[in-house]
Swiss-Prot record:
This is Maturase K. Usually encoded in the trnK tRNA gene intron. Probably assists in splicing its own and other chloroplast group II introns. InterPro entries: Domain_X, Maturase_MatK, Maturase_MatK_N. The lineage of its organism: Eukaryota, Viridiplantae, Streptophyta, Embryophyta, Tracheophyta. The keyword Iron does not apply. The keyword Ribosomal protein does not apply. Keywords: Chloroplast, mRNA processing, Plastid, RNA-binding, tRNA processing. One of its GO terms (cellular component) is chloroplast. PANTHER family: MATURASE K. Belongs to the intron maturase 2 family. MatK subfamily. GO terms for molecular function: RNA binding. GO terms for biological process: mRNA processing; RNA splicing; tRNA processing. It is found in: Plastid, Chloroplast.
Length: 505
């Protein structure tokens, strides 16, 4: 990674621009757009459309297009369009605007990406895992030992000028920020750029990279108050909590106590105070949770602190119910597409003392995840796989495809759902979802062939069922042979990019 960063640094001449604090001249370098669009450095991202528009394929065509578009963005009256600028109206303008936004986002990411290389910024490298992969060991190993959890919804949207002021502290390049302001004002829905829901902003589809950069920078600033949590590492390790129950509980008490120095003038016993408990923080998309072993009063203080920080620093008002404080033993919270909580599981321990033995009844806390069936059915309703009552219907849009293509599409969705929710404690709730998809597939085939579901199932036979079974189910059943597979949680590290039907908010 560092070698690649050095090569890119030398190629982009970043050293010279960093000393002058200017990123704006990089907009007129064609290789920026080639790198932003994953093209080769020798190919031109502008050549193909310029051939259709009558441009000469020279080296100045891309720079000319960028200059003209930037000029149009800086103009105050967007209704004045000359005849020579007719190429930038309609779908052509949308293409060039998207192209420049991709390159512009890549340029704006340079100051942030430099921080990832410790040798460039001369900072210490943090060894803790600040990614989604660190969420799973936190849920499995640490959450069951905590008492309270705050379910936090990151406030949005942020005003454009406040966002630019925040970026000004990170990017000291006035021309680039001014161009960003003009570019955002060019779109009427710029106020919804910071909304994490993809369906609320067409800008996220046309300029996804710039949208992600703006949203990540906004979330980064919202989380800046929690920067001290970097010092607390959360490595990928799994330690069973069933062994040494009493000893673990004893040392857990000792860790949270400190002895105050005794004053010689007062003949009193040593005073014991509780340490300030550690606050754990994890986030996925626009939702985050804070959990701790502290009291409800301290959690309310944290809530008050976060709300005031967002209001004073970003002028953001937390949404009604944006922060919920619940006790883990009595309430569940919705996170990562699961309804999660901590439940007490009865446990019997056999104790042996010399020749006598006796049984001890105790209870241990266990992290529990449940697949919320109603939100998933709501997602299937939006995708038109079933009605509001959960009754499967045919997917008429796919009726023109081949039989194998229809079966493969439904099977792909079913496998992704099973793959994503493999971390559930009770997988039998997914049987209804699989039934809806399987019957919707049969109804789609029956609609195509103008037949009935019974005839389709009899004709296809096992072929219709085999597509909905995954190879990984056979592998997992072989690994966990002799155990109850439905009660085993298996977290796959690629679930962040496979399931679009899971409602995360």
């Amino acid at each position: 990674m560092e070698k690649l960063q050095y090569e890119l640094q030398g190629y982009l001449e970043i050293d010279r621009y960093r000393k002058q604090r200017f990123l704006y001249p990089l907009l007129f370098r064609e290789y920026i757009y080639a790198l932003a669009h994953d093209h080769g450095l020798n190919s031109s991202i502008f050549m193909k459309p310029t051939e259709n528009l009558g441009y000469d394929n020279d080296n100045k065509s891309s720079s000319l297009i960028v200059k003209r578009l930037i000029t149009r963005l800086h103009q105050q009256n967007h209704l004045i369009i000359s005849v020579n600028d007719s190429r930038f109206v309609g779908p052509n303008r949308s293409f060039y605007s998207q192209t420049i936004s991709e390159g512009f986002a890549g340029i704006m990411e340079i100051p942030f990406s430099m921080r990832l290389v410790p040798s460039l910024e001369r900072i210490a490298k943090y060894q803790n895992l600040r990614s989604i992969h660190s969420i799973f060991p936190f849920l499995e190993d640490k959450l069951s030992h905590l008492y309270y959890v705050s379910d936090i919804l990151i406030p949005h949207p942020i005003h454009l000028e406040i966002l630019l002021q925040t970026l000004r502290t990170r990017i000291r390049d006035a021309p680039s920020l001014h161009l960003l302001r003009c570019f955002l004002h060019e779109h009427h829905n710029w106020n919804s750029l910071i909304t994490p829901k993809k369906s609320t902003s067409i800008f996220s589809k046309e300029n996804q990279r710039l949208f992600l950069f703006l949203y990540n920078s906004h979330v980064y600033e919202c989380e800046s108050v929690l920067v001290f949590l970097r010092k607390q590492s959360s490595h990928l390790r799994s330690i069973s909590s069933l062994a040494f129950l009493e000893r673990t509980h004893f040392y857990g008490k000792i860790k949270h106590l400190v002895v105050a120095p005794r004053n010689d003038s007062q003949r009193t016993l040593p005073l014991w105070f509780f340490k300030e408990p550690l606050m754990h923080y994890v986030r996925y998309q626009g939702k985050s949770i804070m959990a701790s072993r502290c009291t409800n009063l301290l959690m309310k203080k944290w809530k008050y602190y976060l709300v005031n920080f967002w209001q004073c620093h970003f002028h953001l008002w937390s949404q009604p119910g944006g922060i919920h404080i619940n006790e883990l033993s009595n309430h569940s919270f919705y996170f990562l597409g699961y309804l999660s909580g901590v439940r007490l599981m009865p446990w019997v321990i056999r104790s042996q003392m010399l020749e006598n033995s006796f049984m001890i009844d105790t209870a241990i806390k266990r992290f529990d995840t449940i697949v919320p069936i109603f939100p998933l059915i709501g997602s299937l309703v939006k995708a038109k796989f079933c009605n509001v009552s959960g009754y499967p219907i045919s997917k008429s849009v796919w009726a023109d495809s081949s039989d194998s293509d229809i079966i493969a599409r439904f099977g792909w969705i079913c496998r992704n759902l099973s793959h994503y929710h493999s971390g559930s404690s009770k997988k039998h709730s997914l049987c209804r979802i699989k039934y809806i998809l399987r019957l919707s597939c049969a109804r789609t085939l029956a609609r195509k062939h103008k037949s009935t579901v019974r005839v389709i199932c009899k004709r296809l036979g096992s072929k219709l069922l085999e597509e909905f079974l995954t190879e990984e189910q056979e592998i997992v059943s072989f690994i966990f042979r002799g155990t109850r597979l439905r009660s085993e949680r298996i977290w796959y590290l690629d679930i962040i990019r496979i399931n679009g039907l899971v409602p995360h908010s």
